Amino acid sequence: MQLAPALPGVFGQEAQRQRDFFVTEVTRLAGVPLSSLKLGYQPTQLAYLAQGLASFDAHGTKKLSPATKQALNLMLASQSDDGSFRNVPCWPPLESSEYHGATVAAHALSLAPGYLSQVGQEQVDAVARLKHYLQTAEPLHDYARVLLLWAASHWDGLISDSQKRDIIKMILSHQKEDGGWSMRTFATPETWAAGVRSAKLIAEPEFKTQPSDGHQTGLVIMVLRDAGVEADHPAIQSGIRWLKSNQRVSGRWWTRSLNTDKSHFITYSGTFYPLMALQKCGELQHDHLDPPR
C-alpha cells in the first residue's frame, strides 16, 4: 500500500488496481462529515491512502495528481489538535498509536511532488503542528523510533543529525546473532498498542528467544538505507544474508502476528519489506525497478 509504486516491474497492473482502490476510498471519505472523519482510525487510514497515492505520483508521473492533493487535504483536515493522527490501539504494529499515524502522514507529505508549494495557510499550520508533534512527543518504544528515523530521512530538518545517529545505533544494537532483527525486541508487550495484546505476546513459545522475522529485518534495512547507511555496512550485509537464507518455498518471509495465531496478516509486510530491502541494496534484479538509494 505504501511502497508498491517503487516496484512497478514486480507488481505490474496490480499496482494500478491498487491505485484505483485508493482513489475510490478517498472519494468515499470525502463524503464523511469532518467531525466523524476525525474519529476512530480514519485519520491514520487517510494518512496511508495519501502516502500510497503520493508514492504513485513520486514514482510515476513525478507530478501531483488531483486525487493525491484531495487525499492530503483530507488527511490534514482530520489531524488532531496536538498534531498527531488518531489511530485505534487494536492491531499493532500498523494500527497501534497516534504517533504511528503521524509518521505515516509525514511520509505522505514528503513524497507528494509539489504539494507543499500549493497549499493555503490552513494546511501550512497543520504541517507545522505535525512537525512540532514529531519533534517533541516521546516515541512509545524503539519501533516508533525506527518510524521516526524513516520519516526524518525524507523530511529535512525533522530531527537532528545527532538524533539520527542515536537511532541508528539503537537499531544496530537490536540485531540478532543470525543477522536478522525481531519486531518483538523493539517494544515490550505492555507498550504495543497500550498493552492490548500483552497476554498473547507473553504466552508465545518464543517469548524469551524472540527470533528474527521478515517484517522487522526488511523494515530495518530499508530505513537504514534511507538514512544513508551504506549497503556494504556489515550489519546490513548480515541482514541481507538472513533474508536470502530465510525465504520460504512459498515465496514469503514468515512473521508471527502480534495479535492472533489464526491469521498472520503481518506476513504481507513481512514479505514486501524484504523485497524493498533487497532492492535498496542492489540485490533484487528486475526490469523497471527504481534504482537503489
Model-derived regions: residue spans:
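Preference for long, amphipathic alpha-helical scaffolds in soluble/luminal domains
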Residues: 1-293
